[in-house]
Amino acid sequence: MWLITILATISCVTAQLSQTNPDCPIPTCTILPPPKTTLDNTKFRVVYTKDQEALIYATNFTSPFNNAQYPLPTLGNHLNRSYTLNYDKVFLNIADSPDMLNLKTSWTVVNNSNLCPLSPSVYRSTSPLQTLTTAEQYCFMTTATLTSAFLYDYTAMKPVGYIRARAEETISFFSIMKTNMVNRPTSPSLSQAHTHTLAAMRTTATGIQAQTFKPQTGFFIVLDASRARAVTNPLDTAIQPKFSPSFIKEVTFDHIFQTTINETARSVTRETTTGYIMNAAKTGALYKASPAYYLFLISSDCRLQQALSVPYDFSLGRFCPASMSCCLNKGYEQYYVNTWLFHYYNLKRLNVLNLESSPVSDHFIQLHRTFNTEHSMHCDGSPYASDTTYNIALLRDTVQFLNGTKTTTPLANEIPQLTDSLGYLKYQPDMVDASDHQNYMAYVTYLMAIFYPTFTEAQKFEFHNLLQSVCYFDKGSISRNQAYHSICHIISFQTTASVPYPIELQIPFTTEPTSGYNAYLVKTPIGSVAIGNQNPFDGEGVCFLTTCIYHPTKKINQKLTIPPVRWQVVPEGIAVVTGIPPNCLGYETYTQGSSFFTIYNDSKPCQPQTMQIAQARSVITTVYSAAQKSDIFVQPYGKSSWVNGSYQFDQFVGGALNLRTLTFTMRKPTQLYVLDPIEGTYIIPDYQTKFPLLTSGTQTYYYDPDQTVTNTTEVSKVTIDFSIRTMITLDPLVFNCEEFICDKDPTCRTQFSSYCQTTQPILAALKDAFEKYNRSIADYTSTIRALTNTTQDLFASATPVRYRRGVEVPLGYGHDLEQPSWVYDLGGTAIVPWIGTAVAVGKLANRVASIEATLYQITQGVKQSIQSTNDKFDKITNILHTHLRPVTEGLVRTNEQLNAFSKQVRDQFTMINTVTTELSAYVDQLQQVFTVGAFYQNQILQVISQLNSLQVYVDTLTSSFTDCISDLNQKILSPACITTHQLLQINKPSDNLGLKNVLTHYINGSAATFYHLTSTKGVYKPLPKLFNNTHFLAPTTAYNPVTGTCFFCGSNACDKSVTVDCDYQPQPLQSTILAVYPTPTGLDLLTITSNKTFEIKHGSTVVTSVAIPPPPILSSTININVTFQQQLLQLQEQVDQLNLQTNYTTTEIQSIIDKYNVEIQNALNQIVDFGPGTPSLALWKVILILIAVVVVIVIIATTIFCSVRKNQSELPLQVLSRLR
């Protein structure tokens, strides 16, 4: 199989090679690093894990950049491309901090060859720098000395501690340059040399067109990698610290560290160069939520700065000329082959959570098989992370198949059918055309992701050599045709020295992918698999700075312009990045619990290794020349040196190692956390580009089309269906004892005759009960369907502009206030009907309030009727279980008798030890009878199991329906009411502003809740949550019930230690807004106040104020049924009572009352659906639907109740008599 894979890969790679260049691929540069004069800012970065933990790190970098463009090298016949340093794409806009480093820097030319640690052969003794001549090679040295660094809290705007070393630490940078002076200043000074001299240097070799020296000052990192979560079940599976990245194993810190700590992190998570497709091939269950991935992100940022500081020291060695013979025969370079072997060796030794041994992998796979064609999807319906899910499943099956633990795997058998005879991926309509970039390479990547883990080490080494022969690598190049996921990059485990990180990782989570290509769909036996460079996050999500992305994710395009939320740091650890000389180095590692500290000692350096320097490039090597001491510690700001600075260690590992390039030493903090994280995604909108919708007082509200599901140009409908899809079905022969057990066998009939005579009456009663049960289920389904017909989310037409009309089923009341809880204030209303004129409102207002109050009681009857119906079905189920039990017990007794009798015959047969034909035939008969009896008993047990399943299904359905009604009562269209797919059908952003006044926001892709309109502050706020009967609270502060005050909450966390003023001062709820209607001067409101007084305001004038009488009490229990006529009488009494108190006469609204009565009569014959009409008619129809549903429920409930009562009285007597 591995040989087939290699051949397929060769053909694919060859096909890619042949499209633009018959020889080797062409390197291209896609990194656009960018113009900023000087970067000397301390950057705090906070990475949240959505619990009370966070990873925080800070970087500091100083470099004399200018706005010039720096051309890339021209190598042989390859293309010449340029790049521009663009720090806006790398660093987020966070306020600059005070200088983190107390740094002193000097820059000189080394005139003594003995003092230059690089190869003396390239050194030329010269005069001072001011008199540099042409075509000479020089050794430059920069020395940076630092004494301390601050840990700075940007929210509190003060230092929280600083890192202190007893002795000054010095970092020296050496550089060898062969220069050709161009436009040399006539009399440059030493300070001018910093900005002019190096920019004027040009090399005479053919590879380098421009070389700029940029000194690197170092990084300071604080992070906590002690916790991780499994991708398979992140909510309740916590990976222990031993599965986190560990640097204290009893191994030497050798080659794995030569390209920064990200290789260790990548080895733990089985991440590959680009960090994408091979996620599917790793056998570890750690993924994006693990600290290893955070280390990967942090090291990516560090390495980017390192690469910008020294842009050409990561591509050592020579390259093949543009000829196929060189590519295939000489290979790329042996250095990289050895490096890969070291990585592979280290990877084999690491502790990795094995997918095969973890049952959570099955849970993860099943969890993502929620849809028919995709395992998951985005909010917009596109496939989500299908490649990860599918490949994990396929990898598990394939590995089990190759290990012999599975005899066959259909998925593995399907793999060869995905290609044609040449190994190319077969064309499908939803695939990119074959001439485009990634088409074939995607399949090769997929194929290798499946089979690469099954290779032997010898096969992997052979395959790696093959890849090295046909693939081209260079810093800044992606691969053939800029395909991001070239098999060369993904499979070969290339070091970061040869392949850059993709721009998506350099700018984590803050930008759209810049690769230019979306994922491709590959149809497989279990669904469409997305393979490509857009890789959403599995697990429960990740927060970076103030942006949180959860599953399923939504693309977010914005610049983060505010600092991280308030956090508290206990600075108990530090990671220091320093330059280490290329020599023998002693190290000591002390551990205490999960913390560790590594000290390097270069006081006795070995002879430096001679580095081969190609003529086509210059090499800058960093050298750290001062010994680190074991007494480096973290000293809290403003406290004495011994506070929080002493550590006891219980384990020590020491040794020596041989390093070539940078080494990162890590010391983990033992405590780092965020207080009370708040769930949710908060997007800062650019409100200047939004449409102003309305103004209330001094506040302007804006409309954001990306935050609403309302579409005013078309009528949409959401179907909510709670029907039971299947009835209980049984083979009719089950109810005929002898035919079911014996068919036509006379011997069997004889044996079971007496048994069937006893059990046949019970089976007849059971059959009758089943038929009644199925009829009851049909009635129950019909009832629920009738009720759900009233819960549809419709749009009605009142003006040429359509608007959203939400149906209230039921129009219930909140738990805390005796009034509807679905509206809090203007601009935050869940559903606000727009009414035409103030006159119309004045005539209809009292009637609206009266009917709304009465319907609350009717709704309670509806709820109780549903509960009563459910209680009846529970009783029916219990009756069936009661009568099945004697049947089962009888079968068990018969089975025991047959067993006992068979045993007696066998014992007698053994004792006599005489074989006779007659006895043998008799025993065979008994065995046959016994087998048939057991089969029959099994059928009955299946019936019982089916009943149990149905009862669970009915209970689940009832619970879901109850939850849906409850959610609708609070104006939340929850997953209990509607599927994600249905919700997506109406989630079509509209460019037509219209009268949109409902903002919907998605939480985890399914539940919809309603949000405020955008205010001039530019922040979306969820509706305030009631926490008692008289107050409400805004979400940017949190209420402390102990102190009665509020404390600060950011986008991700709250800080209980800081007391602030509440966003909204506690005040009584003024009113509930029923409607908004326009006036020439603005907006008027129709409200019900909290003291149950109905008011109509025109401007600031109260037109009328009427007290609302208490509604009548409607009761509906299992023994008392409220008839529809009684409910109508009570409703009419309520209307009459209100008419006596209103300021309007009956004649003024008689036409409305007449129309209302006609609608009531029509509702008795059918359930009315919405259609075009006036707003007032639509409101009446809401009421009519509810009344009609009450009629249907009461009638059906009465019928079911009577039938149950009859069943309760008759069935037990019949069964008991027959059993006797």
From Swiss-Prot:
Residues 16-1181 are virion surface. Keywords: Coiled coil, Fusion of virus membrane with host membrane, Glycoprotein, Host-virus interaction, Membrane, Signal, Transmembrane, Transmembrane helix, Viral attachment to host cell, Viral envelope protein, Viral penetration into host cytoplasm, Virion, Virulence, Virus entry into host cell. The chain crosses the membrane at residues 1182-1202. Residues 1-15 form the signal peptide. It is a single-pass type I membrane protein. Residues 1118-1169 form a coiled coil. The keyword Nucleotide-binding does not apply. It is found in: Virion membrane. GO terms for biological process: membrane fusion involved in viral entry into host cell; symbiont entry into host cell; virion attachment to host cell. GO terms for cellular component: membrane; viral envelope; virion membrane. Glycans are attached at residues 60, 80, 111, 262, 403, 601, 644, 711, 774, 789, 1004, 1028, 1091, 1121, 1143. Residues 1203-1220 are intravirion. It comes from the Viruses. It holds the Pfam family Spike_torovirin. Homotrimer. Belongs to the torovirinae spike protein family. Mediates the binding of virions to the host cell receptor and is involved in membrane fusion. This is Spike glycoprotein. It comes from White bream virus (isolate Blicca bjoerkna L./Germany/DF24/00) (WBV). The lineage of its organism: Viruses, Riboviria, Orthornavirae, Pisuviricota, Pisoniviricetes.
